[in-house]
Amino acid sequence: MTINSIYILNKAGTLIYQNDFGNTEKLSHNSYIRLGSTFHSLHAIASNLSPVSGSSSGIEVIETEAFKLQCFQTHTGIKFYVIADPNHQQLEELLHGVYELYTDYVLKNPFYEIEMQIRCDLFDYKLNRLLGVRE
């Protein structure tokens, strides 16, 4: 079962991290930004569509025949989402693992500025290990 991409958006909807895995076709930088802002907008709209006030947290899963998208949003508004093979079953656990790596290797990095692009080699390395990607 294949993980295609992982995206991290800050609370304003700005793409702060993106990584493709396997044979995923690479897009232009602007296309990645467009995908991130589109998902952020859809997530915000979905969270406001609930007939019961305050009961919706937005989009959590989108499933198609071609892919499965799973989202995890933190209490601070950071969104982690993964695009994977439609048969992949443990994406929620994977996203929690990515969140743990984010807190351990990005937020604790003294050179990282909150809400800015993530450029941390140790985070990339640990993420690749989590996903079983060979260097």
Swiss-Prot record:
One GO process term, biological-process aspect: endoplasmic reticulum to Golgi vesicle-mediated transport
GO cellular component terms listed in the entry, alphabetical order: endoplasmic reticulum; Golgi membrane; TRAPP complex
Presence of keyword Endoplasmic reticulum: yes
InterPro entries: Longin-like_dom_sf, TRAPPC
SMART domains in the cross-refs: Sybindin
Subcellular location field: Golgi apparatus membrane; Endoplasmic reticulum
CDD domains: TRAPPC4_synbindin
Keywords tagged on the record: Endoplasmic reticulum, ER-Golgi transport, Golgi apparatus, Membrane, Transport
Function: May play a role in vesicular transport from endoplasmic reticulum to Golgi.
Similarity comment: family membership: Belongs to the TRAPP small subunits family. TRAPPC4 subfamily.
Subunit field text: Part of the multisubunit TRAPP (transport protein particle) complex.
The protein's name: Trafficking protein particle complex subunit 4
Organism field: Dictyostelium discoideum (Social amoeba)
Name of the gene: trappc4
